[in-house]
Amino acid sequence: MGNINDKSDDEIRQMMGGCDCFVFAAGVDERIEFPKPVYDAYHKFNIAPLERMLPLAKECGIKKTVILGSYFAYLAKERPDMNLTSQHPYIRSRIDQENLAFSYADENFDVSVLELPYIFGTQPGRKPVWVILIEQLKMMDKFPCTFYPKGGTAMLTVRQVAEAIVGAAEYEDYAKFGHKKAWPISCYNMKWDEFLRIVYDARGMGSKRKVVGVPIWMFAMFGKKIEKERELEGIESGIYTPGLAEIMDMNLFIDTKYCFKDLKVTQDDIHSAIFDSIKLSVDAFEGKAKLIGMKGE
């Protein structure tokens, strides 16, 4: 165990010796804000390590690599008309990460990227990503209803992510993809209002609270306010908030066949995974649990 970025090349070679597959499940995502330009931080933590690790993996005789990416990259490729890479530095970085990784693929080195959506479930000692959602929802508790985008999202559980990694590592037919493959990942597709019913139930408020879908322009207006606050603080987010409105309004669903058929992922209880994630997020928000959050360094 240790920080791979602190290891010398020789130490990494020793760690990789005798291994069949290299899995990159590190880096940072869009939740972490940095000083402008934020893209530089994403390159440092998500791309530069691969520029170093993948050549070492090939040198050590490793035959496969699995990289944990984002389903925003899937959306950017499916909907080039949305110009997501020009709006959102984080999405641009994920596309660049995929392209860099695929440049190392050959007949002796299969490269796969899991384009992961939202993940539910808990990890011992780790702060859930959903604490920020609790902060947002609590601001609306005083209202008779909750205002939220109309769309929905792909999702899966923590355990299913692990199974997808194993499935990608053991997949034997990468040759037909030119030894490189981006896997769109989803085990469940859920509308935001259905998701929020589970969230409110986990918060102890029942599952009957009314959720009102907001139009894109209203979400975008709220996003502009957030961007102005960030600018005053000298920070930049990887996702441009006004542009997020269109994404949140759409049903960002993915065919589950890639997980269940190709990668041999098994069914899980997504309702319980969401419930547990929110319960722990509430505890973290209220200071009842000491947890480690995501950080760059």
Q: PLM ranges: what are they?
A:
Residues 100-125:
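Conserved beta-loop-beta element that borders a ligand/cofactor-binding pocket
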Residues 121-134, 168-182, 205-209:
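Glycine/proline-rich active-site loop of Rossmann-fold NAD(P)-dependent oxidoreductases
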Residues 175, 196-250:
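Terminal hydrophobic/aromatic helix or amphipathic segment near a protein terminus
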